[in-house]
Amino acid sequence: SPQPLEQIKLSESQLSGRVGMIEMDLASGRTLTAWRADERFPMMSTFKVVLCGAVLARVDAGDEQLERKIHYRQQDLVDYSPVSEKHLADGMTVGELCAAAITMSDNSAANLLLATVGGPAGLTAFLRQIGDNVTRLDRWETELNEALPGDARDTTTPASMAATLRKLLTSQRLSARSQLQLLQWMVDDRVAGPLIRSVLPAGWFIADKTGASKRGARGIVALLGPNNKAERIVVIYLRDTPASMAERNQQIAGIGAALIEHWQR
């Protein structure tokens, strides 16, 4: 496949939309590849990783417990809640809700967790506190996936998202235990199959979270590397494309394939 930037340009023309991408070394934070890395893109469900980072920060501070049971009702459920809809009778723990939000992209689980951190404004305040002055959450699931052209609500930039992920996974902002827990939830992602996982060679590490919108957007945040090691952060967002979801998936997989093929560069 072509070099990553060539593949990205190709994807933009095939999608008639915009691609935003960054590839960052996890250890050093050095940027290896960037395309529209400072432009805004809808986060969609990729925000759920940051959300569970905020939850884990509360756990580390002693303000929350992963074992705490949350009870909820039918009227708390929103569209696409494959795990939480099964637990109306018994409720779910905070840890189970994070697992559902990240591994299955369960929207009601995300809303229940969002309430514990003070809603969209509370999550945005957490981002500011860890030094991300760009990423913003304004709405709840499922409205946050609206992805209107030119709308800054519920957006990030590839550069800001990558830096924030790096802070959550490697800095002292979360305990070592919480860092490992956040990464493990991403390793266990069950709904990212058609994206980078579809082009992953044997023996490569991946941990990821995807996002989708009915209105022309798609995204993935991932940790990736050969020798089963999380070597780099890769963030890819698409927006304003008329292409089908299958086509969006294919283009993201193509960009992933180009990155993997030209890893040593």
UniProtKB/Swiss-Prot annotation:
E.C. number: 3.5.2.6
Active site feature: S45 (acyl-ester intermediate), E143 (proton acceptor)
GO molecular function (one): beta-lactamase activity
Disulfide bonds: C52-C98
Keyword Disulfide bond attached: yes
Gene Ontology biological-process annotations: beta-lactam antibiotic catabolic process; response to antibiotic
Reaction(s) the record says it catalyses: a beta-lactam + H2O = a substituted beta-amino acid
Keywords: Antibiotic resistance, Disulfide bond, Hydrolase, Plasmid
Residues reported in the UniProt entry to bind substrate: K209, T210, G211
The keyword Hydrolase is annotated on this UniProt entry: yes
Note: The class A beta-lactamase family has a specific amino-acid numbering system, sometimes called Ambler or ABL numbering and often misspelt as Amber. A multiple sequence alignment was used to derive a consensus sequence and then the consensus was numbered taking into account insertions and deletions. This allows use of identical numbers, e.g. for active site residues, despite differences in protein length. UniProt always uses natural numbering of residues, hence there appear to be differences in numbering between this entry and some papers.
Function: SHV enzymes hydrolyze broad spectrum cephalosporins notably cefotaxime and ceftazidime. SHV-4 causes particularly high levels of resistance to aztreonam and ceftazidime.
Annotated family: Belongs to the class-A beta-lactamase family.
Name of the protein this chain belongs to: Beta-lactamase SHV-4
Native organism: Klebsiella pneumoniae
